[in-house]
Each structure stands twice: as structure tokens, then as C-alpha cells.
Amino acid sequence: MTNIRKSHPLMKIINNAFIDLPAPSNISSWWNFGSLLGICLIFQILTGLFLAMHYTSDTTTAFSSVTHICRDVNYGWVIRYLHANGASMFFICLFIHVGRGLYYGSYMFLETWNIGVILLFTVMATAFMGYVLPWGQMSFWGATVITNLLSAIPYIGTDLVEWIWGGFSVDKATLTRFFAFHFILPFVITALAVVHLLFLHETGSNNPTGISSDMDKIPFHPYYTLKDILGALFMMLILLILVLFSPDLLGDPDNYTPANPLNTPPHIKPEWYFLFAYAILRSIPNKLGGVLALVASILILILMPMLHTSKQRSMMFRPLSQCLFWMLVADLITLTWIGGQPVEHPFIIIGQLASILYFLIILVLMPITSIIENNLLKW
């Protein structure tokens, strides 16, 4: 008799994706982050669901409802901080997952990579709208500043912004629709993640060497299921330390002040995971130019397969490209730091240089370095 997991129509799909899946024998811990992202997503949906049971999306009661969750709901404060810091863990895993893809040339799986970029945009949109919901000062002004960027679009910009706001300013209509979108988008993300996985399983996983591993596969279970569980335990440990010891470490104190349209906070800034893009936006004095640079900073990922000039897929055996990759990482950390600083003398020029370097490394230095490496190896 055939095993039920191999014959049952539903179990068969799960079996082929997570149990009997042939996986390369040499994938390192950098390959753990896909499963960690899946765990993060499920976790965020569950905590978000419980928060939505007590939250009200009205400008007069939104702030109070979040306070009520933290004070009066049983373990409401834990759920709230798990959800807020869970978003930070989500983005840490996302950035590492994308970085791994860049380093090991995983972007050569075109469909998987492009759906991944769409996923990144969707997660960023979801996180932004979630940040607006507590209706604190930074929520309100963050929503105002970021949505206002669309007014830079020629001709239709102003109409577009007012259409998104549902009025002439960020108000009740904006908060209600942001809550609706914030609730529905995680399910869209789940669907996209399934498609992402579907395309990945068409080609099979990449591995650190970038060489085909068809002749050396091992079953996903028990080897990688166990490895993923270990990764998940590490992530949960970090998340719990964050939530139970310093839940507000990554937040902004201004968000504990109820939203006031008449009082602008001295430094408007988004959550830490958007600071690199915010720094690129601010480094260009022109509004439209800044918006284009902001979009390009993420959209540039789609160009990666076209910018790949090396004869080797992975950076494992390309020391010059490795140096550039880690320069890019350092540059992104610098941009993240700059994004959180006020717009004054040393920070403006540092931000502008870091922004130029970001695009320069990806568009110019990496492709040229790859050609040099090809010539060094007489390829």
C-alpha cells in the first residue's frame, strides 16, 4: 500500500514541498531564512488577528484602543509587542534573504527572483500601513509625508494623493482604508509566497558554489526540517529577549503621543527598516528626483540578472566581488544610520555620498569587477 502522504491529493503537495523534496547537500545556514520568513508571516497574521479583535480604526479611538490592548486585555501587551517587534524580525530575515540571493547568484532563477521583489514591495507597503494604525504622532506624520510623495508624479499627483487620503488630509477615511489594506495584504503575501515556492521547486534550490547539485541531493526531511527548527528557535529567542526586556528599543517615543495635525514632530522618520530608503530619498533636493531614487533603490533588484557579467554564478570564488558586496552592506548600514539623523551639515553630505555609492556599486562597479575576474581567470 502506498504511503498516505504520497497518495492523498493534499498531502502529496505538502510532501513534495517539505518532506521528500530533493535538496542540495551543501546549503548553509544562509538558506534558513526562507523558512524563517514563512514562520514570521504566520506569526504576524496570528498576532495581528488578535490585535484586530480589540483595535478600532477610528481617529478618535485608535490611539485609546491600542492603549486599552496594552493595559486591559489579557496579555495584550505581549501580543502588541510581539507583533511590532515581529515586523523587525521579518525585515531582518528579509534583508538577509535578499542579501543571500545577491551573494550566491540566486537571482538567476528569474521568476522566483521577480516574485521575490514583488513580495518585498508588498511587505514594505504592509509594514508602512501597519505603522500608521496606532495613530501616534509618528504614525500620522509618517503617513502624511510618505503619501505626499505621490504628489511629485506630474499631472495626476495631487489628485492621486487626495484619492488615497479619501479627503484633503490624512484623516478618518485614510486610517480606515489603511486598516483594511493592512489586514488583507498579509494574505496576498501568503499567496505570493506559495507562487514563489512553486517557481523555486521548478528549478530546485541554488547552493553556495553556484554549480548544479543534481548529482548530490538529500531529502529535505529530516536534514533541513531539523536545521530550520534550530533557526526558528534562535529567532524566537532573539524576539522574546527583545519583547520582554526592551520592547520599545526599535520604536519611536513620539508614537506614544496621540496624533496632532497642528503639531509637527521635530524629526519625522519611519521605522528602522525603511531608513536606508528614506536616506536616499532625502539626499536628493528635488522632490520628484528623490521619489524616483527611492523607488529605484528597491526596483534595482529586478536588474540584477541583467547586470550579472561573471562566468561564475556565485561570489564564493570571486574575492573582488566579495569586497564590493560587503562594501554595499556597509553602505546600507551607513544609509540606515543617516536616515535617522537630522538634516544638517555632516549628515547631508554623508547621505548623498552613501546614496551615490549604493547605485555606483550595483550598476557600475560590480559588473566591471566581474569582467575583470573573468579575465584574471582567462575565461
From Swiss-Prot:
Cofactor: heme b
Membrane topology category: Multi-pass membrane protein
Residues reported to bind heme b b562: H83, H182
InterPro entries: Cyt_b/b6_C (IPR005798), Cyt_b/b6_C_sf (IPR036150), Cyt_b/b6_N (IPR005797), Cytb/b6-like_sf (IPR027387), Cytochrome_b (IPR030689), Cytochrome_b_C_euk/bac (IPR048260), Cytochrome_b_N_euk/bac (IPR048259), Di-haem_cyt_TM (IPR016174)
GO molecular function: metal ion binding; ubiquinol-cytochrome-c reductase activity
Superkingdom to which the source organism belongs: Eukaryota
Binding residues for heme b b566: H97, H196
Subunit structure: The cytochrome bc1 complex contains 11 subunits: 3 respiratory subunits (MT-CYB, CYC1 and UQCRFS1), 2 core proteins (UQCRC1 and UQCRC2) and 6 low-molecular weight proteins (UQCRH/QCR6, UQCRB/QCR7, UQCRQ/QCR8, UQCR10/QCR9, UQCR11/QCR10 and a cleavage product of UQCRFS1). This cytochrome bc1 complex then forms a dimer.
Record protein name field: Cytochrome b
Organism in which the protein naturally occurs: Potamochoerus larvatus (Bushpig)
